[in-house]
Amino acid sequence: MFIETDYFGKIEINEAETITFVSEIPGFPDSKTFVLIPYGEDLPFWSLQSIEEQACAFVVTNPFWHKSDYAFELSDGAKDQLGIEEAEHVSVYSIVTLREPFESSTLNLKAPIVIETKERRGKQVILDDAYPARYPLGGTKAEVR
């Protein structure tokens, strides 16, 4: 399947790798199906690209690579919505807000993207924990190109 993207142009994706969101990402009601596109083999960043909207894409990263003590408990409701049965079938991403210079970019730790990897369901979860929506990326050496 081919999709048009603002960042990568027209690309081919494997439909089996798409992620269906069980609820909308706030502010993006028309985007329900996404795919993760790596920015490069050696970079810890992906584009969470909407299948429905070419211009809807988020730079995401694994928050545990940037804040090793990051931890939260998913509600039973979120687990049920996503069909989570085992922790090994869960991936977590944080949306990155890019700034110049790159070192001043931030991660949204308050609202992670949680993906159940077996059935490929996703949801942005708003945490009650005291995590910030703008956690400094700081010392990360990689750059998004």
From Swiss-Prot:
GO aspect biological process, one term: regulation of translation
Tree of life domain: Bacteria
Location in or out of the cell: Cytoplasm
Gene3D superfamilies reported for this sequence: BH3618-like
DNA damage among keywords: no
Any Gene Ontology CC annotation: cytoplasm
InterPro entries (UniProt xref): Flagellar_assembly_factor_FliW, Flagellar_assmbl_FliW_dom_sf
Assigned keywords, A-Z: Bacterial flagellum biogenesis, Chaperone, Cytoplasm, Translation regulation
Family to which this protein belongs: Belongs to the FliW family.
Assembly, per entry: Interacts with translational regulator CsrA and flagellin(s).
Primary role: Acts as an anti-CsrA protein, binds CsrA and prevents it from repressing translation of its target genes, one of which is flagellin. Binds to flagellin and participates in the assembly of the flagellum.
Record protein name field: Flagellar assembly factor FliW
Source species: Exiguobacterium sp. (strain ATCC BAA-1283 / AT1b)
